């Protein structure tokens, strides 16, 4: 087993996709003195439950920019690291059945083009050519994103972990954090496997366990908002991942 260092600049707790992505990007921007601690194995928390949808189009320009960057990053790292993230970019189709939603999709398509995201605005005949079995009732139009698709959440996480390691990040599995140390109102380190690791900064990337850890520190974490998809009187959206 690798020896855990006694000090580091940043400790990231959590070996899911959020933790591994954080560690990678910290190192990418120069913060290479970073340690990631995972209590079990990478992706053994909630990450492996994810659907793995890869979508470039967002509800705003900022989200679209981030999603485009993410998709490009996965493709770039797959080539650089020579490790598969399970990317399967067969395209995605979004349709609208109301005028309001149709205008919204057209607006999003315009935003996507500003960030060089390939998007096709389709009428019902064009939609049927892509997805012949679709029920065309009430469909006003749609947009097709050829660069969208799916990825393997475990594969993406391990891809980011490998990329982070190449940049100098040290990752320790089977290393549950027993205690977070606080000095003068600031986090000063963590206790792992009966060993103290001093640090300047701490990142909580522990998903559903973050609230519990935050409460132990007297810190309020961001609450979760659960969304439920359902048909309404205003619009109905159908998003399809297409097989080739």
Per-range role (PLM):
Residues 5-16:
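Beta1/beta-strand and adjacent pyrophosphate-binding region of the FAD-binding site
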Residues 19:
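N-terminal Rossmann-fold NAD(P) dinucleotide-binding loop
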Residues 147-196, 200:
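Helical element adjacent to the flavin cofactor pocket in flavoenzyme catalytic cores
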Residues 196-228:
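Central helical "cap/lid" subdomain
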Residues 225-233, 244:
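Conserved small/polar residues in nucleotide/adenosyl-binding loops
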Residues 26:
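Aromatic pocket-lining residues of Rossmann-like dinucleotide-binding sites
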């Amino acid at each position: 087993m690798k020896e855990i260092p006694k000090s580091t600049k940043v400790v990231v707790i959590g070996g899911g996709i959020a933790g591994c992505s954080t560690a990678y990007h910290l190192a990418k921007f120069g913060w290479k003195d970073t340690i990631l601690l995972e209590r079990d194995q990478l992706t053994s928390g909630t990450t492996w439950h994810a659907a793995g949808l890869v979508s470039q189009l967002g509800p705003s320009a900022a989200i679209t920019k981030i999603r485009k960057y993410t998709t490009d990053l996965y493709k770039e790292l797959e080539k650089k690291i020579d490790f598969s993230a399970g990317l399967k970019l067969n395209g995605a189709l979004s349709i609208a059945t109301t005028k309001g939603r149709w205008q919204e999709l057209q607006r999003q398509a315009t935003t996507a083009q500003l960030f060089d995201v390939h998007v096709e605005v389709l009428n019902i005949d064009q939609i049927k050519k892509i997805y012949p079995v679709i029920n065309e009732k009430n469909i006003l139009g749609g947009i097709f994103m050829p660069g969208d698709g799916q990825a393997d959440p475990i594969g993406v996480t391990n891809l980011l972990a490998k990329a982070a390691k190449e940049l100098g990040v040290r990752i320790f599995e089977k290393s549950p954090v027993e205690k977070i140390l606080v000095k003068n109102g600031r986090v000063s380190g963590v206790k792992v496997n009966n060993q103290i690791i001093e640090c300047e900064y701490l990142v909580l990337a522990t998903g559903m366990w973050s609230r519990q850890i935050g409460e132990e520190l007297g810190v309020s974490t961001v609450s979760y908002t659960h969304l439920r998809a359902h048909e309404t009187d205003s619009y109905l959206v159908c998003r399809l991942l297409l097989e080739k």
